[in-house]
Amino acid sequence: MRLPIERNQECPFDPPARLRGLPPMARLEMADGHLGWLATTMAAARTVLGDPRFSARQELKHTAVHVVRPGGPARPAPPGFFAATDPPEHTRYRRLLTGQFTVRRMRLLEPRIEQIAADHLDAMAKAGPPVDLVTAYALPIPSLVICELLGVPYTDHDFFQDRSAALVTPGRDGAQATADLTAYLGELVRRKRVEPGDDLISGLTGELTDEELTYVALILLVAGHETTANMLALGVFALLKEGLPFEEGAVEELLRWLSILHQGAPSRAALEDVEVAGELVRKGETVALSLPVINRDSAVFEDPDALRPDRPDARRHLAFGHGVHQCLGQQLARNELRIGYRALFERFPGLRLAVPATEVPLKHDASVYGVRCLPVTWPTAD
């Protein structure tokens, strides 16, 4: 079996049928022909992500679908690209960054997120329906927030949004996009050393080299808006299509039910022979994860295919990963989603799709699943 596998347009939120019913560890041919594994259960996934005998180092891994990796394939990640490192190197970066993503700091951002959402809802109301929710709301909110957090000028948002999208979209020149972003961020880091501000990049200039901070910023910038923007729009699509109201607890259930990382990510390479779910993973073999299937594991979730906004154990999902590489910005993402959904449905309680659900274009081939656009409408006074 190989990835990617398209989802069904009639059931756009369900895992592809070919991935259902697989054993906990199924054989998977990677993009370069390497014969690895696909983990499909929560137990197997937690083992792979939590066992130090599995490595996140990119030079050891084979990818399920073709992606551009900084430094090139089969080469170590450049300094600062912490997502593709193992302890103790990863521990150093993680410790520095954890201090920047404190619960207190994330809470202090909430009023600003609320204001950004309100401003964009005002603009939507002024423009009148229909609007594309992706460009009018879902994309700018996390983009503005991560820009302010990092100290990246939002005036350059068209540039970095385009380059970020190229990194997760097959057919785009990901290598050039990486080069463009690292050049841009490298110059920004150098400016921050001379003229520091009250932002995350400035706060780390005394701890990291220019190269390290450039790649730290690259990860945070791309991950900080690409995933949340897709999740915000796809979550609205799901609620509208399923005819469900938004509830405060719905964020965790939507994260579980939608699983936007859907093409074999994350993945790990075995550093030695390891038994997982009764299968022997040999040293050097790559294990990819099928999060859409894992997050609907019937051994963990009752009636897993049902979208239940009040599900009490939804937070057991792996949308933010597990182990030492668990998402640093997960509290920020949760806040953005909670505030974004709530503000939208409070402002436009009659919100509905402006086109049939089957006509909403899906990102089948992208490594981050979502909708390319989401036409919505609402009742107006006139």
Where are these regions (language model features)?
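Cytochrome P450
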Residues: 1-382
